[in-house]
Structures are given as C-alpha cells and as structure tokens.
Amino acid sequence: MPLVYFDASAFVKLLTTETGSSLASALWDGCDAALSSRLAYPEVRAALAAAARNHDLTESELADAERDWEDFWAATRPVELTATVEQHAGHLARAHALRGADAVHLASALAVGDPGLVVAVWDRRLHTGAHAAGCRVAPAQLDP
C-alpha cells in the first residue's frame, strides 16, 4: 500500500472504537509509511483529553489511549511546518474554506509530493479540501 497521511481525526479512529476505526486500522496496518504534520501530536492529545472530560473515555481508557498514541506517534514520519508549508497552508485555507489546522494538514500532505499518497481523514472540511486539491482520500466518502 502507498504512503498514508493521517490527520488527527484519523489517528483518533486508531485510538478509540468508533465508526471508521476498522478502515483507519487497515490503512495503518497496510501502509508503507504513515506520515503526519507535527501538529497532529497536540491535536490528538487534546481530543483524547476532551473525550475523557465528556465521559466518552474512562480514566483507564484515557491512559491506555495516551500510551497507544505514543507508540503510534513514534512510528509516524513527521512532516515539519516549514516556511513553504506555512505559506501554502495560508493559500489553501482561503481556497478551500479550511480552518488553520486543517490547512496545515493539507499543505503538509501535499508537501510529501507522492502522487500515490492517501490522505486518511474524517474531518468533513479537510476531507472536502483534500479531495478538491486532487488528493486520494480515505474514506472515499463521509457519511452525511
């Protein structure tokens, strides 16, 4: 399988059991390499903490997810936030109506420069923007 770029929403699917978790796991298990912006690290930690605050995860489940996250992150090739990625993200934010973090993820994925790259994303805006920018996205479509 090709390289797969995981945004924070895709990583959360790996760490919790929810719709899309099976596909995220298959992408992780089958890819030649997993990549993501360094921005994903704090985003995922924040998402896990929010899930615990909302009582979607118990303290024990949170501890397990945080431990698993460290393992996933250690196996991920980080894409650095260079000046080029920064500037491209600014343009992508406007072109695709993206939030700042989503624009950074899309610019980071595009910076990889691999035409076979798959972008694993469950965030609706980023999914739409990545598709419009010509990326292969997984899942192919998001449920309405």
From Swiss-Prot:
Record carries keyword Transcription? no
Q: What Pfam families does UniProt report for this protein, alphabetically?
A: PIN
* Molecular function GO labels: magnesium ion binding; RNA nuclease activity
Where along the chain is Mg(2+) bound?
A: 7, 102
Give the cofactors, semicolon-separated: Mg(2+)
Give its E.C. classification number: 3.1.-.-
Which InterPro entries does this entry report, sorted A to Z?
PIN-like_dom_sf, PIN_dom, VapC_family
Q: Which family does it belong to?
A: Belongs to the PINc/VapC protein family.
Q: What does this protein do?
A: Toxic component of a type II toxin-antitoxin (TA) system. An RNase. Its cognate antitoxin is VapB49.
Q: What is this protein called?
A: Ribonuclease VapC49
Organism listed in the record: Mycobacterium tuberculosis (strain ATCC 25618 / H37Rv)
Q: Which gene carries the instructions for this protein?
A: vapC49
